[in-house]
């Protein structure tokens, strides 16, 4: 049986795309995934160009694959994702043993590219932007648990001064309304209970509705997804404050399947830096969104993204970021030191802040957010949380784990329940009382009496 090894860098969109690469190759050639590159007939790197380290890591990994290619000339080596889109044929020039190079919008052409490489003996490069056609050529999604990702749009049209995404994934293009609903319904029929709607900027979604001229905005899409039988929870990422509309805020009042958790990247706490980033909103406007959401959902947890050390960032600018962190009380953050990306406007800005200063700022920021995350977890001890059971605990397979609405993993034991009955709980919603908070998980006891034998604690 032929096998494919896929290494994924970067965001959840890339995770989704990697799953689709595996689906496409399985449907076309019967390839099955492997975790061992030495066993693979096809090795793919799904790349990220958001930060320089991620980009260089790709070429480092390619160097290690070179020996495998030398031992097995029939091995197919491919590079996809945003680095592929940005670098194109120069990847082959730098690593001549690479067979195929493809972008995020052309992953559906992967079998054709591999076939052309085998027939012609020449490397194949396709990093074009054929809009949204890839979704018309993808096989049905494979379900591997009660949660699933569904891409609703591609690209970004915001052109933040530091970001390469518009250049590597193209402009915003939304999937048709009915196509998204059909994919979610198909997943629900296979046992999926929670969907995460994906896009570089999901709240810019504007999907075609049938053969009409009407368009569905993101709030309407959320409303219809919530009506699909079997779907219990809806998450989404990533959203942009500039397009967080009043309709979307109101959805939190009417749509109870939207979880009490939101990832809303702010990037910085200084208006001066936000303007240099071309983010299109002020700190006050961002805080207004959070205030309105918390008026509707007082317990909603907020996660975000921060960039530290953007060109021109002063101590006063960073202090404003810390003020925002304390005021909002973030539950989590993806925080990074600014990494200049070639071809972006910010790459030309003067930057005289020492790296050591940036590193100290990042450590201070992340330590503060980590402490707040721990405080929130401790505050959950004694509460009863509704969790979606996802499968066996990673540390103890005899136990189960689930996830709370605010995205925390809860491990729990059911020692009196036979293993077969425990397995049947995967995909079910259970109430658990949180009894202990750990740095990266919670411990709970089941409190719900169920007809399938789960006892009350």
From Swiss-Prot:
Keyword field: 4Fe-4S, Cytoplasm, Iron, Iron-sulfur, Metal-binding, S-adenosyl-L-methionine, Transferase, tRNA processing
Residues at which [4Fe-4S] cluster 1 binds: 11, 48, 82
Occurrences of domain TRAM (ranges): 378-448
Enzyme class: transferase
Species, as recorded: Ralstonia nicotianae (strain ATCC BAA-1114 / GMI1000) (Ralstonia solanacearum)
Any Gene Ontology CC annotation: cytosol
MF (Gene Ontology): 4 iron, 4 sulfur cluster binding; metal ion binding; N6-isopentenyladenosine methylthiotransferase activity
Family listed: Belongs to the methylthiotransferase family. MiaB subfamily.
Catalytic activity: N(6)-dimethylallyladenosine(37) in tRNA + (sulfur carrier)-SH + AH2 + 2 S-adenosyl-L-methionine = 2-methylsulfanyl-N(6)-dimethylallyladenosine(37) in tRNA + (sulfur carrier)-H + 5'-deoxyadenosine + L-methionine + A + S-adenosyl-L-homocysteine + 2 H(+)
UniProt-listed Pfam families: Radical_SAM, TRAM, UPF0004
Annotated Radical SAM core domain residues: 142-375
EC number in record: 2.8.4.3
Cofactor remark: Binds 2 [4Fe-4S] clusters. One cluster is coordinated with 3 cysteines and an exchangeable S-adenosyl-L-methionine.
Main location: cytoplasm
Binding site for [4Fe-4S] cluster 2: 156, 160, 163
SMART domains referenced in this protein's UniProt entry, alphabetically: Elp3
Protein name: tRNA-2-methylthio-N(6)-dimethylallyladenosine synthase
Domain MTTase N-terminal: 2-119
Cofactors required: [4Fe-4S] cluster
PANTHER family to which the protein is assigned, alphabetical: CDK5 REGULATORY SUBUNIT-ASSOCIATED PROTEIN 1 (PTHR43020), MITOCHONDRIAL TRNA METHYLTHIOTRANSFERASE CDK5RAP1 (PTHR43020:SF2)
